[in-house]
Amino acid sequence: MEMATTFTHDVTTSGKPLLLFLILITLTYSLGIVFYRLFRHPLAKFPGPRIAAATYLYEIAFDYFGNGAYLFEIERMHHKYGPIVRLNPAELSIKDGEFYDKVYVNGNVRRTEALPSFGDGMDFNNSHGMTVDHHQHRQRRKPLEPFFSKAGVARFESNLASVVSTLVDRLRDYEGTGSVLRLDHAFAALAGDIITTMCIDSTSMTFLDDKDFSRGWYELFHTLIISMPVFMNFPWIIRLVRLIPTSILKRVDPRSQMFRDWSDMSVAEIKKSLQRKATGEMLTYQKGIIKAPTLFDHLVNSDLPTSDMSVERLASEAQVLMGAGTVTTAQSMSHLVVNVLLRPDVEKRLREEFAVLMKQLGEASLPKARELEKLPYLQACVKEGLRLSHGLMHRLPRISPDVALEFNGLIIPPGTPVGMSAYFMHMDETVYENPREFIPERWLGDVDPKMDRNYVPFSRGSRRCLAPNLAYTEISMVMAALFSPWSPAIRLQDTNASDVDPVCAFLLPLPRLDSKGVRVIVRKNKE
């Protein structure tokens, strides 16, 4: 017994110096990193708070515990330190509208790469949007561009009109009942159905037909957005989640099954497209011209290299398009519709413009996109809605791997991530009078060129949003469906601007997290 006690004591005693040594090594290493970041790092000369330069934990704390609040801390940094700040150990933020086009440049100007952590955190590295390398990104994006061009979207206009008509029919189900419905859920369902019709030839899976407008679909994306700060800073977590069997994940979070079902459907469609190509059934692709019926048919018949034709990579492409196309478009629609309904003068003028068009057309149906493009007040409303919903509020870091950038006499070393937020561009008081106010009239008549310069809801450059044409068409058609003489008479119910104003600046922005959403009732037109 005494020997056992002595042995245990010896082991415990001998282990203490080792533990202390490991702690000392860890502290020394950590202090060395902090010293390097503060005094020897290539960005040490740039202004900003020391704590942000020393550790990434400062940013993580704001985004995780502050619900995406780091953007507003960066705004405070700019107010204190000036138009360029070091926002974390390796990255710079610039707040200067004139410099935007020097960060977000076209592909023929110079190589531009993305920040790897953006793709790592979402596990979609193989999609074109998350591809880091400049040349590989261009190679993967190029075949997609004609599909989402103005002409490409026009090919799908009848599909879009059909989905929007389904939305109108669903709203009429609530007409005169006094029942409250979630319009933000309906918009997410609509956007999801539109992407589905473009990717998949025929499907029985529709979100709008669900009695609650596929509430779980909306809530799934909402949860993922809130989780992004964790995934982006600790990307191994999302990889672990991917390993969880579907049967277990379905029990833990039944909503996730909807995305799995959509992903499985995409994979099946990709395999069909590859089979059609192999048998010669689909050989209609010409460079820059859309003839294939679905996105996948188009891609498998494009000039993508074989290495980029795998089912896994094409499925990743579809998943990113579905996520981005659902969330950002639906939120922009919600923001726009609420702001119109809150302003009787705006709603009246918009309805009058639609009434004139409908009288000219002589029928109670959705106008063509080309007709909606000619309505100045509608387009002013759409533009103002996109400005205030921002698209992405989060900075979008870009890396110039070969060329140093110069800003206000400071040389930004090659390889430095530099980001600029659309929020800063859109809220610039020197460019927009009362920038937080919804004022469509600001886009009518002679528009200050600086307003167009600062208008970046889809970003710019070689990595700009792929589908602004689709977004404009969708939103314009929805507005026509809701504010024409024959439209369902929707009215807000216990909903105000705070239910749509983006105040949580995650990678994709959200309104206040305690919001009960965009609630409306549908009155009878004579009420």
Curated annotation (Swiss-Prot):
InterPro entries: Cyt_P450, Cyt_P450_CS, Cyt_P450_E_grp-I, Cyt_P450_sf, Cytochrome_P450_monoxygenase
GO MF, one example: oxidoreductase activity, acting on paired donors, with incorporation or reduction of molecular oxygen
Native source organism of the sequence: Alternaria brassicicola (Dark leaf spot agent)
Lineage: Eukaryota, Fungi, Dikarya, Ascomycota, Pezizomycotina
Its biological purpose: Cytochrome P450 monooxygenase; part of the gene cluster that mediates the biosynthesis of the diterpene glucoside brassicicene C. In the first step of the brassicicene C biosynthesis, the bifunctional diterpene synthase bsc8 that possesses both prenyl transferase and terpene cyclase activity, converts isopentenyl diphosphate and dimethylallyl diphosphate into geranylgeranyl diphosphate (GGDP) that is further converted into fusicocca-2,10(14)-diene, the first precursor for brassicicene C.
Protein name: Fusicoccadiene C-8 hydroxylase
Cofactors (names): heme
Membrane topology, as annotated: Single-pass membrane protein
Alphabetical keyword list: Glycoprotein, Heme, Iron, Membrane, Metal-binding, Monooxygenase, Oxidoreductase, Transmembrane, Transmembrane helix
